[in-house]
Amino acid sequence: MQETALLNMVPRTSTSKGANKLLRNNGYLPGNIFGKGMESISIAVKKDEFKKSIKEYGRNAVFKLVDTNNKEYTVMTKEITVAPLINEISHLNFQLVSLSEAIKQEVAFKIIGTEFLESKRLLLNSHVDSVPVSGLPHDIPHELEIDVSSMNSGDSLLFKDIKLPEGITSDVDPELKIITVKGLKRQEVAASE
């Protein structure tokens, strides 16, 4: 079971481009909280606190957002918008969650063991970066780890080959190809030396 990350938030009274830019210049990230049966709430969180929490707890962490009146919102990050030119987070969307109700969340793959493939002059081709999974918020993994160190040329890894954590399900096609491994051609080997 994951820990819950605590983040302080402030309400946003204006959602204009200029107001959001001013927030970012003052070290805040504009965002929204949304959920079933509620109106979206415009908020801002401190950028450095959010980045620290993501680094410590992971992208799929459960957050407890606390406003200036000590009202708490249990949320998960639904979307992180990154400004392409400066590669910085520019906006956040949080989804209100109940810790006792299953949710659907996108989970990224973390590939380990690539150095073994490189030592065998094998090339890894990743077809899918993430998949949607369902489960209770605290059971959603930060990432799904895939060890490719024992794969050989011609091997494929299908979604059905990945063991999901207990309590986690997915409606992804079991035959979905996640990774393939191939040997480098002679020309590619010569070029890499």
From Swiss-Prot:
GO terms for cellular component: cytosolic large ribosomal subunit. Part of the 50S ribosomal subunit; part of the 5S rRNA/L5/L18/L25 subcomplex. Contacts the 5S rRNA. Binds to the 5S rRNA independently of L5 and L18. The keyword rRNA-binding applies. Keywords: Ribonucleoprotein, Ribosomal protein, RNA-binding, rRNA-binding. One of its GO terms (biological process) is translation. This is Large ribosomal subunit protein bL25. Coiled coil: none annotated. It comes from Lachnoclostridium phytofermentans (strain ATCC 700394 / DSM 18823 / ISDg).
